Every structure is written in structure tokens, then in C-alpha cells.
Amino acid sequence: MTRHTPQEERCMPKIRPAHADDLPAISGVCLAAFNQAVAPSLSAAGIATFGSVAATHAFGARLQGDNLILVAEQNARVVGMVELKEGRHLAMLFVDPACQGQGIGHALFEAVLPRVREPVLTVRASLNAVPTYLRYGFVLDGEVGEFNGLVYQQMVRAAAPSAGADPGPH
């Protein structure tokens, strides 16, 4: 078990399922991180596509479907989020630029792993995020792709050992 100093404990975010009233903050975190790290390398079409996918109402619609959204909350403020689509695809993982480098993204990733329902977890990583996903155990799966202006690298990794296992009687 990892031991944290008292200062680190105060800085560790609370990870919890997203609620409808979190959606504007989730959208804000995603757009801020995207605009800083990803948007400069994309076309106007890619930026517009991401803007529509990361809009508050779009998150609301996905929250009602078979998507799980977890947030990292620090001092009563959403500072990160992860979205798992259909129990098998990591759709988004973003941390507020002001809070990056504190392990929040890794904590969100670790929190979502037990929720994966398939033996393999996939992600379409923005090119700047590929090194992070490699550290998280993903491997490249094919060539760089593009969809509606968003450039990505398909990646895969084995999910948690219990993923895809029979959940037993209900």
C-alpha cells in the first residue's frame, strides 16, 4: 500500500460518479485541457467536433446511456474526469491544466479499471496523450486515424482480471 504524506493526502482528490449538476464543470475541464494540449495540432473541424462532444448537453445525454463518468473532486471543485463507454472503451480522460502532474489522471484511470466489463479496454488517444497511455499499460493498435478532424491513435490493453467475467446470479 502506498503511503502518502499529510500534504499529499490533502491534495488527493475524491473520485466519485458524476452527477447532472457536475456537467458544466466536466465540460469546462475537458475544454480547458483540450484547448491547451490538443487543439493547437488540429484543424478547425477537429476543434469543432470536440467542442460538440464535450458540450454540457452531450455529457448529459451520455450520462443517461451506458456510459460511466467519474469525476475527481478537490476542495469541492471538479478537477478531472474519466468516461467509460459501454464498459469497454475509455472515451475521455482529462484533468484541469492547473492540476496536472499531481497523479489525478492516474487516479481516475485506476478508479475506472474495475468498472471495465470486457477483457480488453480500448482508447482512441490524442497523439500527445500516447506516452501517458503507454505508461498505463496500453499498446498501439494500428495506424494513426482521423475522424471528423480529430486525429487519434487506437490503443488497447488487457482490462482488470475480473473484467468480462460472469457477474453471477442477479
What spans do the regions from the language model cover?
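Conserved GNAT-fold acetyl-CoA-binding loop/helix
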Residues: 31-58
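Conserved N-terminal entry element of GNAT/NAT acetyltransferase domains
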Residues: 1-21, 161-170
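Conserved beta-hairpin
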Residues: 67-80, 85
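A short helix-loop-beta-strand connector motif used in the catalytic cores of GNAT acetyltransferases and
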Residues: 55-71, 89
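Conserved acetyl-CoA binding element of GNAT-fold acetyltransferases
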Residues: 85-97
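Conserved acetyl-CoA-binding loop-helix of GNAT-fold acetyltransferases
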Residues: 97, 101-114
